[in-house]
Amino acid sequence: LLQGLMRNDYQIIILPEPVESEELYCTRWGEEHLLFSLPPAHPLSGSKGLHLSDMDGETMLLFSQIGFWKRIPSEKMKSSHFLVQKESYDFEELIRHSALPYFSSDLAVRQQGTIPNRIFIPILDPEANITYYFVTKKQSRNRFSALLERIRKQNAS
């Protein structure tokens, strides 16, 4: 993404880490926090928060296109079995019609809403939280001033 920004393929990019460069402007854009989605009958569904280790060993649904989040299940839940779905339609059908746990995030819940008969529980491990950064060329910063002001206000609240 950074190379594309420098080649002018992109005007802005969002990254999961800050960038320091004389040519680039970088500011905090927002955060995302992973959640476990559990059916009400699950033994841990009453928890206020869970660690990845609490769910290690479970069979869970997992969507394949989760980007950098993919390392968490493979590194932190080695005893779990993941039923990996490549098609979003298949994944959506399974999460609506099965009792298997799956990962979600606060951003996904805000954008797509909650699913009936599901309880969303925050994951307490630090790696289940990410800060995103807005990056553009310094010379383009004025072009995005309205958007940057909106980001600033959002982060202040």
Which residues make up each language-model segment?
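Short beta-strand-centered segments that line the small-molecule binding cleft or hinge
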Residues: L1-L34, I119-I121
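Hydrophobic residues within well-ordered alpha-helices
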Residues: G4-M6, M55, E93-A99, F134
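A ligand-binding cleft/hinge motif common to bilobed small-molecule-binding domains
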Residues: I14-E22, R71-E75, Y89-I121, D125-P126
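Short beta-strand-to-loop elements that line the ligand-binding cleft
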Residues: P16, L62-F63, S79-D90
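Flexible hinge/capping segments at coil-to-helix
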Residues: E22, C26-L34, L38-M60, S145
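Residues embedded in well-ordered beta-strands
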Residues: L35-S37, P43, P101, I119, ...
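Secondary-structure junction motif
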Residues: D56-H81, F144-S145
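A late-sequence structural motif
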Residues: I119-S157
